[in-house]
């Protein structure tokens, strides 16, 4: 049995398309952070079992959704993601097949402002999203939460679709907020001088995305993403150097990012 686990906060613009893309699943669980735009009601109408809980952080919120499922297999999705037909078929075939894998990485087709970004490290962007409930759990960390799996992992062939930022303004706003959380997890800064981190890492980020990973092939959007990721890297280390973390209120910043 497959259970889909989703967390939401004011996702009325996304939740219907997301849930319709997984309507074939035996169970859909949504943990909602008291949305004010009708997200919870929409999810209920579309057949999801909805729970409303206060914000606990990305990983804890996702683990809460997983814990409320009853299926043997979990498909963890974000509200701005969709499961196309070919991936649906592959998932259905995979979970009834008796193989050695306890979980599967799924590639993501990331769309930015309506364009599929094929380069710059944005594709295939593998994420472990399908896993056996008894073997996986989200690692509790401030940002970039991922599934920790006790067992071997495989890869699915077909990608899911991820409709990321709606506009340049939306992207910049989220990057500004997200940098506060990312500054919490910079082990490299303990081994690298902050001056080097502030200068070399942003430059490397740009060169890596735009040249080494061929971001230039995505045109103006590829250039924008490389420049903005370099700025995000600078901002992350700058906030760390300014010891801005205490005043950043990371839990509140996470809540804003989830909205």
Predicted regions and their residues:
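Short, well-formed alpha-helical segments that are part of the catalytic scaffolds
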Residues: 6-24
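Short, structured coil segments at secondary-structure junctions
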Residues: 24, 46-47, 126, 149
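Conserved donor nucleotide-binding strand/loop of the catalytic core
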Residues: 40-68
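A conserved acidic beta->alpha catalytic loop
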Residues: 21, 32-44, 78
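Acidic helix N-cap motif at the loop->helix transition within catalytic regions
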Residues: 16, 37-46, 86-87
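Intrinsic disorder/low-complexity segments
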Residues: 247-259
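Catalytic-site signature of metal-activated, phosphate-bearing donor transferases
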Residues: 63-66, 72-73, 77, 84-246
């Amino acid at each position: 049995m497959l259970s889909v686990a989703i967390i939401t906060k004011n996702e009325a613009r996304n939740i219907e398309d997301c849930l319709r893309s997984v309507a074939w699943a035996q169970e859909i669980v949504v943990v909602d952070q008291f949305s004010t735009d009708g997200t919870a009601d929409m999810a209920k109408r579309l057949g999801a079992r909805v729970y409303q809980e206060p914000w606990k952080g990305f990983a804890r919120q996702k683990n809460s959704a997983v814990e409320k499922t009853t299926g043997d297999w979990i498909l963890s999705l974000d509200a701005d993601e969709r499961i196309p037909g070919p991936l649906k078929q592959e998932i259905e075939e995979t979970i009834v097949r008796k193989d050695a894998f306890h979980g599967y990485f799924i590639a993501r087709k990331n769309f930015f402002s309506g364009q599929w970004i094929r380069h710059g490290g944005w594709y295939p962007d593998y994420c472990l999203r399908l896993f056996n409930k008894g073997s996986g759990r989200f690692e509790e960390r401030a940002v970039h939460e991922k599934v920790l799996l006790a067992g071997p992992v495989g890869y699915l062939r077909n990608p899911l679709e991820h409709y990321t930022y709606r506009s340049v303004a939306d992207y910049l706003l989220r990057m500004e907020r997200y940098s506060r959380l990312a500054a919490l997890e910079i082990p490299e800064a303990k081994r690298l001088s902050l001056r080097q981190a502030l200068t070399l890492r942003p430059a490397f980020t740009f060169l890596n995305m735009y040249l080494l990973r061929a971001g230039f092939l995505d045109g103006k959007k590829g250039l924008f993403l490389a420049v903005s990721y370099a700025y995000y890297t600078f901002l992350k280390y700058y906030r760390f150097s300014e010891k801005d973390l205490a005043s950043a209120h990371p839990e509140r910043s996470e809540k804003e990012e989830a909205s």
